[in-house]
């Protein structure tokens, strides 16, 4: 009984405005940020290095290189209300499900071919 209840509650939280994207794609995620009494949308753009989970618990990790060559990774719940938008900037062609090897690479070595 409780499993059915959890699934029903989860179905209400599902988002329908999520574009189709895969590991290796470059995406721009708009995240709602609360500062004091106002709320704004902050964009986080990078390469999807991982997708995992299913249903309401599905999440993905985006990696980007910030200033001075520091790598920054953020993990987002796919159906989270804090996510304002997800836009696919470019589609990458990769042969792995998890791109953890990008953590050890920088510059041209971290490039991903574009999917046609």
Curated annotation (Swiss-Prot):
Keywords: Ribonucleoprotein, Ribosomal protein. One of its GO terms (biological process) is translation. Coiled coil: none annotated. The keyword Ribonucleoprotein applies. Gene3D superfamilies: 2.30.30.790. Pfam families: Ribosomal_L19. GO terms for molecular function: structural constituent of ribosome. The keyword Manganese does not apply. GO terms for cellular component: cytosolic large ribosomal subunit. SUPFAM superfamilies: Translation proteins SH3-like domain. Belongs to the bacterial ribosomal protein bL19 family. HAMAP family: Ribosomal_bL19 (MF_00402). This protein is located at the 30S-50S ribosomal subunit interface and may play a role in the structure and function of the aminoacyl-tRNA binding site. NCBIfam families: rplS_bact (TIGR01024). This is Large ribosomal subunit protein bL19. It comes from Chloroflexus aurantiacus (strain ATCC 29366 / DSM 635 / J-10-fl). The gene is rplS.
């Amino acid at each position: 009984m409780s499993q059915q209840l959890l699934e029903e509650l989860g179905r209400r939280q599902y988002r329908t405005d999520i574009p189709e994207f895969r590991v290796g794609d470059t995406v721009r995620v708009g995240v709602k940020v609360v500062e004091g009494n106002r709320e704004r949308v902050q964009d986080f753009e990078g390469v999807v290095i991982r997708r995992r989970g299913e249903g309401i618990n599905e999440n993905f990790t985006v990696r980007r290189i910030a200033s001075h060559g520091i790598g920054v990774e953020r993990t987002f719940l796919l159906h989270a209300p804090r996510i304002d938008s997800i836009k696919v900037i470019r589609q990458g062609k990769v042969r792995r499900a998890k791109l953890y090897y990008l953590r050890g690479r920088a510059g041209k070595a971290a490039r991903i071919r574009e999917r046609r």
